Each structure stands twice: as structure tokens, then as C-alpha cells.
Amino acid sequence: MKNGQWKQHRKRCNMLLTIKQLQVKYGKQTALQINSPINFEKGERIGVIGSNGAGKTTLVKAILGLTAYEGRIVTELKPEQMAAHMQSNAYVTTMPVKRIMEMILDTKIKDNKELQELITFFEFEGCLSKRYNALSGGQKQKFTIIMIMMQKAELTFYDEVTSGLDFETRQKLMEKMVEWYRDKEDSLIIVSHYYEELEQLVDKILLLDQGKVVAFGRTEELFRKYCGDAIFILDNNPVSSSLTKSFCALKSPNHLIALSCRDKEEERRL
């Protein structure tokens, strides 16, 4: 095999998924339109970011075969080789969490070291005896994440894993995710509204807006292009608001002020 042929062969072997000319419509409305090919390679962690209605969840559903689409999604993965954390999960609400976990995973916690490790890592031991409907929002997310991680899938999707959580709970949960995946080579597609959730966890960002691709590339490159050299996050109070009026503000939770610095001089001033 010639050198050029070998490179092409190796590239194909590393390719996990390719999207070609993808279109999703709900009635007459186009929810997602991807015109240029997008490639996902093994071991890559892709962050999909955009506002409500950008097409993020629609993309995940199309890849999983949960919604009709036109175009091509090329992959050798079978459905059972993919795992997905979706925004809504239909667990039995009145059953103890431990029983739900053991029934779905078909294993006993006391006999499964991997499951024990995840429960300990996410500090979930105190939740096992609770009924699902008694869990807090953050505890429910931890439960679903543990269930997803136990599948050890070739490709894992996380769709708005911090949806509905307060800022502190959201931060702590994402710190756990970053720590867990730090030294692993799992292939991930993570959907979020917030860039700061993805910054330490993903290699590339797919930025969607109104169903169209705005950009796709390395995380740091897109950060500099759309956010500047640095971002400062401050508590939103009258003093901070008054002192930072001349700087470029980014979208952020109501109790915070996020500011973009376009260069080192602006960063020094701030």
C-alpha cells in the first residue's frame, strides 16, 4: 500500500461518523440544515452549542435515528453502540433508585466494581434508598449520567446535562464530568447552551444558529474568534455593572456578568 493510500485508509479507520447534506423538517419549517460535510473521529469530544431552537437536540435525534431526515449520516456504529443522555427520561418515579439501577443494568451494585466506582465518584451513595421522584434536579442528572457511563458505548451523547440546575450545581456537575473523562479516550458529543461548560471537556465546537452551522473547529480557535482573548465572570451587582459598562458583555445567567477581552491591553484594564 502506497503512503498516500495508507493515510487515507488510516483516516477512514479513525472516522466514527460523517454528516453529509443533512436536513430535518418539522412540517414546512426547516429545523436543521447542514450543507458541508462534518466528520467526527474516534476519541474526539465534540461540543454542540447554540441558543434555544438552534437545532442542537434535533441533530442528536437525527444521528440516533429518532427523527426523520434527508441526506446522509454515514457510520458503522450500530444503535446499541451508542448511548444518549436526553433531556427527558421516563424512569419509574415511585421506585427506589437502587432498584431502578439494578433492574435496568441487570446487575447488583454489591457485585459490580465499576458501578460502585461511579456511585462513589459522583457522591451518590446517599441517594440509592430514595425514590426517583424524591431526588433533586442535580441528583437526577447524576443518576442518569451513571446509567449512561455504565453502557461503555462507542459514542456517547449528553444533551443539556445541566438543564434546569442552579449555577453552583451546574458548575459542580461539570467539574465532575471533566475529572471523569480527563484521562479517557471516549468519543463524546455534548450539547449545551454554555461555552464555559464545554471549554475544558471538548476538543471541537459545532456552533449552530437557527438550524444552520455557524462554525465548526478547534475549541480554542473558536473561543478566540467569538469570545476574544479572555473572559471574565463577575457577580452582577451595581458596583460591577457600573465599572464594566465600557467592556463587551456576553450572554450569561442573570446573577453574573460575563465580559470578553479583545486583547491583552483590555484584559489588563479589566
Kindly label every feature range from the protein language model:
Residues 88, 93-109:
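Q-loop/switch helix immediately C-terminal to the Walker
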Residues 191-193:
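H-loop/switch region of ABC-family ATPase nucleotide-binding domains
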Residues 131-135:
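Conserved ABC ATPase signature
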